[in-house]
Every structure is written in structure tokens, then in C-alpha cells.
Amino acid sequence: DLDHPTQALADALWLQERFPDGLQGRKIAVSWAYSPSYAKPLSVPQGLAMLLPRLGADVVVAHPPGYQLVDACLEAARSGAESAGGSFQLTDDMDAAFEGAHVVYPKSWGPYELMLQRVDANRSGDEARMAEIEQACLEQNSRYRDWICDERRMALTEGGDALYMHCLPADIGDEVTPGVMARHRFNVAREANKKVYVIMALLAAAKVPDLVERLSH
């Protein structure tokens, strides 16, 4: 649950296409968003946080209390920003993350500390504790239904309509409003398409020892 390399690389490829001059100085908001299915993995936001600052982007991760990312991933994000001239920040304000952003990536992820407790309870076969944790997760999640990518928040972004991204499938009506998704449906489809080429490239690199030499001829 620490990283999602193929998704992060596919997203980077899509961003490279959209911003051919590079990501230096581009603000990218990676934000938690509400979803009824609260237990989504942290791998996508953490993968983005660790990769995009290394490409020079100014990455802001926004989440409400209880949805922090893993410390090791945060350290990697900060280190990448320092080495590449990008920046990395955390905030508990979705509006602040969206303000002036060139790219927004709102999606749900699970409450890490509670999820760890659930793993321990499951390992010990403690069904009563599992039920308690489930209830705590649902109650915590329901407090933040207003964390949604909507028209008002998109209006805060650079030019009033930043590039919307999502790893798909998005929870329309919860993570993002139908109107925002309708405007960006073509873009998220093109984003998803990049994953095919990234995976093909990774397989080729793994299977062909002299790949660079072969491609140069």
C-alpha cells in the first residue's frame, strides 16, 4: 500500500504531454475526497507525492484529520522536492490546495492508523474489535462529505478550470460532481490510456537487457 509505480508513471507521462515545458512551477493538488467506500488504498496519493516533486512540481497534499500518509513516503516526497527544485506541502484545507492549482487529483483513501488496527484485529480473530473499528471508520469518513471536487473548488484553480485527474473509477457524486467529471471525461480517459504504454515499457525494460541499444538502431 506504499506506492503505485505504474499509476504514478502513467500520470507523469500524461502530465508531460499536457505540459511539454515541464512541471517546474506547476502546482499540483493531490487531495483526499469523500467516498462511501472509505477503505481505498493510499498507494496512489503516495506514489504521486513521491514522484511528482522529483519532476519539479509544487505538490500540495490535502486531507482531513485522520487521513495522513505514511511517514516514510512523506520523507521521500520532501527529499525528492529538495533534490529537484520542486516543493511539497501538506494542508488540511481542500480549498487552499485547489487555489491556483494547475492540476487537481481528488480521490479517497483510507484512514491509515485505523486500517492498521483493523489488520491487527483481523489477525487475532477479534470480531468484536473488527466491528468497532468498522464503525469508527464509517463515522470518521462521514464527517467529511463536503470534501468533493465541485464547480466552486474548480473555480479556485488556475484559470478557473485546472486539469482534473483521477486513477479511475471515480465515485461521481461523492469524490467529484457529475458536471466536473463530464467536462473532463475525455482527459481522464486519455490519462488512463497512458498506463498501457507505461506497463509495456516496463515489461520491455525487464525482458530486454539491451533495450536502449536496440531502440537506437
Language model regions located:
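Buried hydrophobic packing segments
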Residues: A8-L15, L48, I199, L203
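Short, conserved loop/helix-junction motifs that constitute active-site signature segments
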Residues: G22-L23, P53, E151-D161, R183
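Phosphate/diphosphate ligand-binding glycine-rich loop within oxidoreductases
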Residues: D1-E17, I172
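ADP-ribose/adenylate-binding Rossmann-like module
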Residues: L114-G173
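Glycine-rich phosphate/diphosphate-binding loop of Rossmann-like nucleotide-binding domains
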Residues: Q16-K107, Y112-E127
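Adenosine-phosphate binding glycine-rich loop
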Residues: G159-H217
